Amino acid sequence: QGVADWNILIRTLETHSGPEKWHATVQAGGGVVIGSSPAEEVEEARWKAAAVTESAWGFRTGFTENDLPEREVGIFPVPTGLGTVQSLMPGLRVGDEEVGAIGVYPCEKLDRCTLLIDNLDSFTRNIAEEIASLGHNVVIVGGKTQSDKKSISNLADEIMRHVQPERVILGPGPSVPESYPLTMEFARRSIRGELVVDRNHIPLLGLCLGHQALGIADGWDLIQSPMGAVHGTPSLIKNDGTGVFQGLPSEITMMRYNSLVLEPKKGSLVPNSWDVTGELVMGLRHFHLPIDGVQFHPESVGSPRGRELLDKFLRKRPLAFSDQLSRQAE
């Protein structure tokens, strides 16, 4: 008996040695996602299985010789609407001295690190790798916990004491922000001006669900998008050039995965980014604290300027109390 971690078994041949001969099971599958045809997914799974049986035994299971479609295979260019997608290189080359370390809490203390709250999202590690490739240490901590409200507050205190981060990122994830108590605790602390290290307000960035958590913490409503769900779609994002959008074009392409959107209310946060219609909020910032949120995924290969946006956030410095008072006076 061994222990193994399995990824998605899209096309698999599982073999077993019997008393007299080998036996094999062929498995193939696909995924029904937004925009796909279930019937075509089933046919594709049969096609995948047939490729295995043909290579192993010389016949196509469930198909005649003429049933399977024959199509031209080619490498197609990246759509021009995306601009230059630098992340499509075989490997992002970064000097060893510039690469940050990645730790999972509890872990040894990493100096000048970014605290990344993981909300059970498959992209969390991608975000951590992107942060590290930009030269910053990162510590990952799970945002979902069964602790009560008092214990959550104590856990947040413990994490802040041990990690002493220079900044916090509230990561993306499935479901709604309230499903992740630690994420909501950090969101509320930041809005209240209580996310402090050495009397400095440390920067916080919310990504997708993390962005939604910030809105909820400030009293905004989280609703089903009136324009429907968007899954894995590069989308045109408009912005006003403030917050993490400073220095970026007023229209940029970013990858979206969301069915929920925030409705703004009067509070401490202000929208600074919208979808192409100008109706759906895609970004927000705090009036005077270093708090930003974006509804999209900047770490995605479908976000050509996403790495630049993350770098802008990572370069933000903590805000001293005296500077905060000056900003409030303005």
Annotated model-derived regions:
Residues 161-247, 251-253, 310:
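Cysteine-nucleophile active-site neighborhood
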Residues 242-289:
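Catalytic beta-strand/loop cores that center a nucleophilic Ser/Cys/Thr
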Residues 149-163:
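Short amphipathic alpha-helix with an adjacent loop that forms part of the alpha/beta core around
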Residues 114-136:
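Short, charged N-terminal beta->alpha structural module
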Residues 1-73:
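Conserved hydrophobic core element of enzyme catalytic domains
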Residues 137-146:
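A short beta-strand-loop structural module common to alpha/beta enzyme folds
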Residues 107-113:
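A short, charged/proline- and glycine-enriched loop
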Residues 76, 83-101, 111, 300-330:
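Acyltransferase
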